[in-house]
């Protein structure tokens, strides 16, 4: 299965997500249920993730905005480093949301939505802003999506270095 097949499957599942599963658990409820058993939530990893991103941004000498969303795409944390670009305040959370919505990095998604591909124009078909260049990654823990991370402020290459 190539990346195109993976993203097509993700899109198909997004369109068909039921309000509840056969077990009667809402999909987001399943993530919450997993969190109750493990004690691991996106909020519990925020400090670690932010510290790692800030250290890398400082090492590169790039002021950035760091945004973290939960598994539903809701913003749980945002920090703007001194001198970070103003537009990054919007881009970072949108990158994090995109990573959660498609369950893949924004750089990978951008590669499969180019003209001539089956997903071309997907960003115009949804209400929330979708970012199609690097800087957003899903936060996975034990094969569970717990949230998304968005970095904005440097070049795309620099944002990708920091987010990874």
PLM-predicted stretches and their roles:
Residues 2-164:
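Flexible, solvent-exposed loop/hinge segments and secondary-structure transition points
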């Amino acid at each position: 299965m190539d990346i195109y097949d993976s993203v097509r499957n993700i899109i198909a599942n997004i369109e068909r997500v039921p309000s509840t599963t056969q077990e009667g658990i809402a999909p987001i409820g399943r993530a919450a249920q997993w969190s109750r058993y493990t004690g691991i939530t996106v909020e519990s990893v925020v400090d670690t993730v932010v510290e790692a991103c800030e250290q890398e941004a400082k090492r590169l000498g790039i002021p950035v905005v760091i945004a973290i969303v939960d598994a539903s795409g809701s913003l749980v944390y945002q920090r703007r480093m001194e001198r970070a670009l103003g537009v990054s305040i919007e881009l970072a959370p949108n990158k994090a949301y995109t990573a959660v919505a498609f369950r893949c990095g924004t750089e990978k998604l951008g590669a499969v939505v180019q003209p001539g591909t089956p997903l071309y124009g997907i960003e115009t078909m949804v209400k929330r802003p979708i970012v199609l260049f690097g800087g957003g990654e899903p936060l996975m823990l034990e094969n569970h999506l717990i949230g998304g991370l968005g970095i904005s402020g440097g070049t795309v290459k620099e944002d990708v270095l920091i987010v990874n």
